[in-house]
C-alpha cells in the first residue's frame, strides 16, 4: 500500500465526515473495517455506498418482506431490473426509479437523466426498451414554483425520451401542498428480450477485463447519491452542481452498441453507472460475483482536465456502462463501440482478493474490502410507530352541491383535469406499436417480436389514502394497478414499486413506510402480483415538512390477443351501462379521503376506502373474462371521483352521452364515493341479459345502471352537463394554468 493511502494528505476531521453524510457511529465502523483512517477517496466511497440512496439501510429490512416469486418471475429484486416470462420465448424487463431530489433543483436535467437512468437499467439486462411511463407529483398549483417545476420536468422527460426514440405511453400526475418543497419524478421503462438472452451484473473470471464504455466522465453529479439521502433546506438551490447532465443522443448510440454486442458471446457481466457512478457499479458487480477488482483510474475517459481519483469515483456523469468481457473479446468490442462513436477503455482486471484496489498512474490511492460496502452494508431497524386510525369523515354539507355542479368542478380540478398538455409533449407513437394512447386505464402496446401479443402497463398510487392509512393505501395502490391492467383485458403479472417517503429517522414516517410495505405485501399475495424490482426514495422533506407517503406501483400485464383489449371510450348509443363490484357499506358511498370531500367540501379527512382483496380478485377475473370473450365494448375502473367522474371520462373519450337510472335518490355519496374494486362497463344491449346471468352464476355483484346515448349526462331524468361542456372544463385547466 502506498504512502498516499495509509497517510492521508487531507486530515479526516469530524467536519469532513459530517459533510460526507456519515454519522459518528458509521465512521467508527469505517475505522474498524479499514483498521486505519481512510483517505479522502476511501471516505468518499464509504459515503456514497452507505448512503440511503445506495444502501437502502433504513428500508431493506422491510423490503425483504415483499412477495417476489411466481412461476413467471425469472428475476426478482436485486438486479438492474425485474424479468418476467410473457410466453413465446419472450420476457418483459422493467423497473421504476425516482429522480426526485435532482428534479426539484434542476427540473429539466433532473427529469431527463431520470429517464436516461431507467432506460439503462432495462437495456443493461439485454432488453430493447419499448415503453416509458412516469408518475409525477407536484405542489399546490398556487405555489410560485409549481408551474416552473411542471414545465421543466415535462420538457426534460419529453426531450430525453423523444430523442432516444422510446414512446412515453402513460403515467399519472397529482398535486398537493405537501409536495411544494419536494416534487416527485418516478420514471418507469419496460423492455422486451428473448428469454435465452438475459444479461446479469455478477462479475466472474479472474483476470477478465473490466471495461468502461459510453460517455466520458465529468464533474457533474458528484455526491448526487448523498444529496438524495438528506432533507432539503432553504439552501438546496446551491446543490445544482450535483445534478447530472444527460445526452439522449449518446444514450441512443449506447443502447444500439450494447444490444449489438449482446448478440455476440463477449459479455460476462454488465452494469450501468447510475447513483454513485463508477463506485457503485464496480462494487456491486464485484460483490455479486465474489470477486476483487484492480482499477486504474488514470485510464478512465475524462471530459475535463485535472480530474482527481475522488472525482472520478464519485462522478454521476450519464450514459456510461461497465462490463466484464471474456478473454480475447476486447478488440472486437472496442471496434464495435468505436463504430458507434463511443468511448471504450479497459480500466481494470478482476482478481480473487475480495478488495477494490484503486491506482492513479501506478500509485495506490484506495484499497477497500468490497463486501462491507455492498452486500454487507449497514442495515437499520429504525423505530417506528403505526399511523393512528383516522376519525370518521365529517360529511355535513355533502348534499348541498347539486351533482351537476360538483361534477364540473371535479372534472376540471387539478387531480382530474386532462393531462393532454403534458402527454402531447411526449412522442407516444414512436415505434408504431402504441395501441392505447395516454388517458385511459393502462397503456397497451403491440410486440413486434410476437405478432398478436401485447403488453399493458400502468402506474398508480393515491397518496392521500396512504397518508390516512398506510396499510390500506398500500393495498389500494397495488389493487388499482391490477384493476387498471384488468380493465384493458390484460392478465396482470408483476409490479415494480417506487417508495417515496419522508425522513425515516422519524418514527411516524418510518411507520408510514412499514405500513405501506404491509399493505403492498398483502395485496401482492392475494392478487398473485409479485414485486420484481423497485426503488426507495427517502428524506423527501423540506424544512421538516414531509411529502404525503407515495408508494408508486408500476404494473405490467400481458395480452395474448392484443386486439381483444378495450378502451374507456363509449362506442355506440343504446348500449347498457353496468357496474361490476359492490359497495363496501350498506349505504354504498365511501367519501372518506375522496376527491369530492376535498374539492367540494374543502376537507381532507376520514379513513380511505377499504380494499377487499378477495372481492377485488373475484370481480376482476370475471371482468377480464368478459373482455376477452368480446362481451364488453368499453371498460373503466372506478377510482378518483367515483361513478360519475368515471362515466364522464368515458363519455368524453367516446364523444357520446349517457343516462344513469339509479334506484332511489342519487345522492352525491353514491355518485362520487370511491368504494374500491369496481368497474364501469358497457355491453351491447343484446348481450346484457347474458352478462347479468353470468355474473349471477359467478356470484359477482353486477348492476345495470344506465344506457349510452345523447350528448349529455343524465341522472334519473335530470339533464346534467353536456359532453362538450365537460370536455371544455376538463381540457382547459392545465393549459390555462401553464400559460400563467
UniProtKB/Swiss-Prot annotation:
CDD domains cross-referenced by the UniProt entry: PurL_repeat1, PurL_repeat2
Q: Which GO terms describe its molecular function?
A: ATP binding; magnesium ion binding; phosphoribosylformylglycinamidine synthase activity
Q: Which domain of life is it from?
A: Bacteria
Kindly list the positions annotated as binding substrate.
Answer: 98-101, 120, 244, 316-318, 537
Swiss-Prot/TrEMBL catalytic activity: N(2)-formyl-N(1)-(5-phospho-beta-D-ribosyl)glycinamide + L-glutamine + ATP + H2O = 2-formamido-N(1)-(5-O-phospho-beta-D-ribosyl)acetamidine + L-glutamate + ADP + phosphate + H(+)
* Active site location: 53, 99
Q: Please list which residues make up the signal peptide.
A: none
Stored InterPro entries: PRibForGlyAmidine_synth_PurL, PurL_linker, PurM-like_C_dom, PurM-like_C_sf, PurM-like_N, PurM-like_N_sf
Q: What is its main location?
A: cytoplasm
Residues reported in the UniProt entry to bind Mg(2+) 1: 97, 535
UniProt GO BP: 'de novo' IMP biosynthetic process
Keywords of the record, alphabetical order, are: ATP-binding, Cytoplasm, Ligase, Magnesium, Metal-binding, Nucleotide-binding, Purine biosynthesis
User: EC?
Assistant: 6.3.5.3
Its pathway? Purine metabolism; IMP biosynthesis via de novo pathway; 5-amino-1-(5-phospho-D-ribosyl)imidazole from N(2)-formyl-N(1)-(5-phospho-D-ribosyl)glycinamide: step 1/2
* Residues annotated to bind Mg(2+) 2: 121, 272
The membrane-spanning stretches of this chain are none
Subcellular localization is given as: Cytoplasm
Q: Where does ATP bind?
A: 56, 95, 497, 534
The similarity annotation says: Belongs to the FGAMS family.
Role: Part of the phosphoribosylformylglycinamidine synthase complex involved in the purines biosynthetic pathway. Catalyzes the ATP-dependent conversion of formylglycinamide ribonucleotide (FGAR) and glutamine to yield formylglycinamidine ribonucleotide (FGAM) and glutamate. The FGAM synthase complex is composed of three subunits. PurQ produces an ammonia molecule by converting glutamine to glutamate. PurL transfers the ammonia molecule to FGAR to form FGAM in an ATP-dependent manner.
Q: What is this protein called?
A: Phosphoribosylformylglycinamidine synthase subunit PurL
Organism per entry: Rhodospirillum rubrum (strain ATCC 11170 / ATH 1.1.1 / DSM 467 / LMG 4362 / NCIMB 8255 / S1)
